[in-house]
Amino acid sequence: PPFRGENMKEQLQLKNHLKEVRTEANLSQAQLAEMVGVSRNTISSIETGQFNPTAKLALILCIALDKKFEELFYF
């Protein structure tokens, strides 16, 4: 079965293309952070997979970078 126990949490880890998209847009972590109202450290943590953004922050990032959710995030 695809999702069982502890494996489910691991398999549902949200991954992202945030760093690639941000650099394509010629934005620093600090610039993007200011645009979306979070700290630079939060952007860094999202990019490295240490932190999963809330649904609201994920949507704000998509709007700020003019990308669809599936262009920025994946499982």
Which role does the model predict for each range below?
Residues 38-51:
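Recognition helix of helix-turn-helix/homeodomain-like DNA-binding domains
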Residues 16, 40, 55-59:
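Short alpha-helical elements of helix-turn-helix
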Residues 56-71:
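DNA major-groove recognition helix of helix-turn-helix/homeodomain DNA-binding modules
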Residues 2-24:
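A short, Lys/Arg-rich alpha-helix, primarily the initiator
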Residues 18, 32-33, 43-46, 72:
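Conserved hydrophobic/aromatic packing and binding residues within compact polymer-binding modules
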Residues 16-35, 60:
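Short basic helix-loop element that most often maps to the first helix and adjoining turn
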